[in-house]
Structures are given as C-alpha cells and as structure tokens.
Amino acid sequence: MAVALIATFMMLTVVPKYSLASAEALDINNTEQLKKYVDDYFAKEMDTYHIPGAAITFVKDGKALFSAGYGYADLDKKTKVDPNDTVFRIGSVTKTFTATAIMQLYEQRKIDLNADINEYLKGFKIHGLNNKPVTVSNLLTHTAGFDEYYEDLSAKPEPLQQFMKTHAPAMINEPGVESLYSNYGYALLGYIVESVSGETYDQYIQNHILNPLGMKTATLHKNENDHIASSYAYDAAKQTYTKQPYVITDNYAPAGNLSMKIPDMDPYMMAQLQSGSYHNALLKDETSQLMQAKHFSKDPSLSGFGFGLWEDIPRQHRAVMHGGTVDGFRTWMYLIPEEKLGFTIFTNGSNGHALNQAFIDDFNKHFYPVAPVNNTAKLNLSEEAMKPYTGTFISTRYFHYGIGRFGPKISPPATTVIEATGPSELKVTSGSHVQTFVAERENMFVEKNGSDRLFYYKTAKGDLHFTLSSYPMSSYERQTSAIPALASGIALVLIIILSTIILIISALIGMFKKDAKSTTKPIRRVALIANILYIVTLPLAFTYWNDLFGAAPTPWKIALYTAAIAFVLYIIVALMWVSLIKRKSVNGWVKFGYIIPTIAGLLLTPYMIYWNLVGKFVLSVM
C-alpha cells in the first residue's frame, strides 16, 4: 500500500466545514477555567460510568498545563489516585511508542515503510494471504490481514524473535484490504525494531524515547516498588466491583506493556505535537506529519489510520488518538496537532473507554464547539433497497482459526443492530448507544445529527461488511446462526454418551454371562476407553479454552492428549470392525448398532480441532 499524504487531503475536501456555534466556547488558554471544567466533569461522570479511579493530564503550546487525579487507586485500601504517585498501565497506547520507534528508524533510512517485512525478519518469514507481501506500512495501519490472536499472552517470557516465529496467526485478508486491529502485528513491529537497530525492544524504547524525554517512571516491566493502581471490572447487575488480576504481557510488550505515572505523558505528547522544547525531540516535523497522516480507510471520506494513531471523527480541528486496554485499565491519548494540544486519560475501571469517549465529545463541545448539524438524505432509497443494509452485525475481530474459535458460538460477542426507520434512513444500535444515519450515496450513510459516517462494502468473498468513522480500526459482518455448529456438536456428544452407557451395561452383562467367545468384546473395551477419554476431554476443552488469554492451563493441555488418544483408539475400533465384517463374524444388527458410535468417535476430535476447542497442538500429537 502506497504511503501518501494525498488520502488525507481527499478526506479533508469531502468533509463539511463547520462554523462555531453561537454559544460562547470556553477558553482553552484559560488553565483555571479548563481545570474547573475537568474537575466538575470527572466529579460527576465517574459515578455515571462506575470508574473507581482516574488521572488526566493536559499539554498545550509546549507547556504542561496540569495533571489531576480522581477517585481511588485501590478500593479496598481506600488509596486515592495521586497523579504524581499512582502508576497506571497504559495498554495499547504503547503501540504509539512502537510506531514512533519505527518512524525514527525510517527517518534514519534503516527501514522502508513500503518494503516487504521479510527483509527485516531473521530466522522466519511472514507471507500475506495468497502469498501477497506484507509491508511495514501494513503493520502500522493494522492491514496486514492477521487473524485475532493472543495465545500464550502471559506465558513465560521468550525472546521476541522466538515468540514471533512460533506464534504467527493465520491470515484472513490480503494485505492492505481491511483494517483488523492486531496485537501480534505491533509485537512484530517491536521485533523489527530489534532486528534493525541491534538493540532489544526494551533497550531501544528506553534509550531513544523514554530517556531523551525524561520519562523516569515509565517502564515496560512490572516494578513491585511502584504504587500501581488496582484495576476493576464493574458488574452492573450486582452493582459490585471485582479486582482484576495483573496479567503479565511481556511476550506482547511492543503492543501494550508500558506503565507510568500520568505526568510522564506530558513530554511524550509535546514531542508528538512538535511543540516547545520538545520540538524534534523524537522525530523531524515531516516525519511527525507522515506518522499522523491518514494512510488507510475504506473510503476517502472516512476517518482512517495513520501510523500508530487513528483519526477522530471530523470536528472543528482534526485530531488523532489511540486507546489502550489491559486488565481493567482503560487509557486514551488525544492530540490536536493544529492546536498543539493534547491530553491523556488513565482509568482503572473496565467502563473507562465509555468515560473517555464521552469526555472527548463533551470537551470538544465546550472548547471547540461547532454549529448543529442536520444532514438530510441525498440518495433516495426505497424500503426494498434498504433491506441489504439492515440486520444484526458483529465485529470481525474474533478468532477465525485460532484457539477459542468456538467462543462466539457459545458466548456471542456484542452486536450492532441496524434497522431501516424510513426511506434512506438507518438506526444503528450498539448497546445503549443509538445513532441515526441517512443515505448520502451508494453504500455511504452520514450521521443525521453528527459527523460520523457508516460505509458498506463487499469483501473478496462477497460478504457485506461495514465500518464507521468513529471506529476505523474495525469492520463488522452479519451475524450468522450458531445453531448448525452447536447442533452437530451436541449430536456427536450425545451419541458418545449414549454409547458409553450401552457399553458399560454390555460389559456388566458380559461379566455375569462370562461370554469368553464374544468376538466384539475387544472392540467394546477399546471403544469404552476412547469414550471415557472423550468424556474427560469435553469439560476440559469447553471450560478452559477461554483461559488461553494467558499461558495454556494444565487441564487444557491434558485435553490435547486425551482427544488425540481417543481419536486414535477409534481408528483402531474402525479397523477392528472392518476385520470382523470381512470375516462375517457379526450380524447386520450388531454392525448397525456400532457403526454410528464409531463414526461419531471418528468425527468428534476433528470437530473439536475445527473449532479449536483442543487447538492446533493436537494435530502435532496425532
């Protein structure tokens, strides 16, 4: 994918210009007024969104305006958030540091952004779908085509090269076709930093970003001496907070492992904004502009991806940003380059992104207001023409081939429901968030009372997907029924259970009859052992697959072997039956009675492999 600034210009030419609203805006240059606004907002909205603790910091025109903390770093201990003392994990905002490192090496002409990444990989290769080359630019914009993947995320740390080599996910899209957020892709960029610079990723980030900016509290590894905030998930039904475990993510460090006190974000944001004494501290002006420019979107009018940053929806000023999620921490960095303004929010509650997004909207409304928008349809679509756009959709960011592929079938992801509410008008409902869009042109809808955009497109397979300006890192597909997958699996399991009961009864009867001449006794014994292994495997597979966010648990590893052994035993059963049938040692009813369980036994392991309930490892066992 070509790297060009033209796409950004095109985007700006098709987005409507906004004038200031008649209401008087708050003064962004009045720090006292800004601080009062922020204090009032967080005092009110943290309870609304059930956020235990938060910290925020603002910079403008090369100066740190203020940092503030709200709520609790630890609910049990009643420890309050202190912006100068409390450490938060920043999650995927780490990706902006990785992207900055890549841009530094690009600036030094050590990396070609349009080069095949295999030029920088040592000891292994990555090939795109249909053998198309994956470029550095593809990794930066999340368009390499990787499937979702986080196996062994918190396993024992390995050298980055080794982990990248052994944990490459499947490819589901050709490079440059769709944006599908990828932690593996950014971890791979971290390895490219190592390969090109000759330093470890940790060393490079420390020597070329953290140290030059004086970010003394920032670290890529957990420091037990730091006052790290606890993080929490909120249960709305029970109205309770649950402390979340600290997940070690060293194997994906370049994708989300940084933690720090919030004032350390000040010099980093100022360096990204090329302001004050931090001008050229990390990158030259033209390199910063290239990093912040739009390099991918499905349509020029949509907000899109830069390198390590994505665009906000159109407002008075263009903004770029990045969010972060790890454990119960939710982080957001928001930059308005034209204004030399930036702020970062740290929260330790799982609803933090809802608070962050609401703050961004409210902040712009008060400090950079625009005139009210009332878009009308420019394309007349009949009720019949609207039908293809409606339905229930889910994000394409799920396991298509990896471990946990069955997850969306038994635990459906969040859905987005789209309904036609009139000619050329769509209502989009995602959770409690509702938007109305009107048709602007074929496959393009614009928010009726806002600046968001909804765009539909066909994939290479002919499937209908859509994407939103407000969420450019994801696409959405129509939700399919889970019934066929569940029904076939349930049928196989019921056959195994029923045949196990019959085999046990048969064995007990055989003990009393002492029928030593039975030709089927050896087969029944082998089949019974195989069934018992399956019955052990199934609860392990279904119970523990969701724990694979970290290191694979021991019970799940046992399931890998038991499934493989059961399958091999059923191959033996099938061969034994063929032998008996050839010798005409069994009658028709006996053959019929055992052929169905044998087929079920032969199909159950492949079924579990297909849905990755026992994972790809079982193939190597077999």
Labelled PLM ranges:
Residues M1-A7, Y561:
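Sec-dependent N-terminal signal peptides
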Residues D27-F88, K110-D112, E119, H127, ...:
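Short, conserved catalytic-motif segment at the N-terminal edge
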Residues Y18-I28:
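Low-complexity, acidic Ser/Thr/Pro-rich repeat tracts that form intrinsically disordered stalk/linker regions
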Residues W332-G349, L464-L468:
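Short, well-ordered beta-strand elements
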Residues Y70-D74, G128-P337, S350:
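Short, surface-exposed loop or secondary-structure junction motifs
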Residues F9-S19:
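C-terminal segment of classical bacterial N-terminal signal peptides
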Residues D39-F42, I56, G62, R89-I117, ...:
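Active-site SXXK
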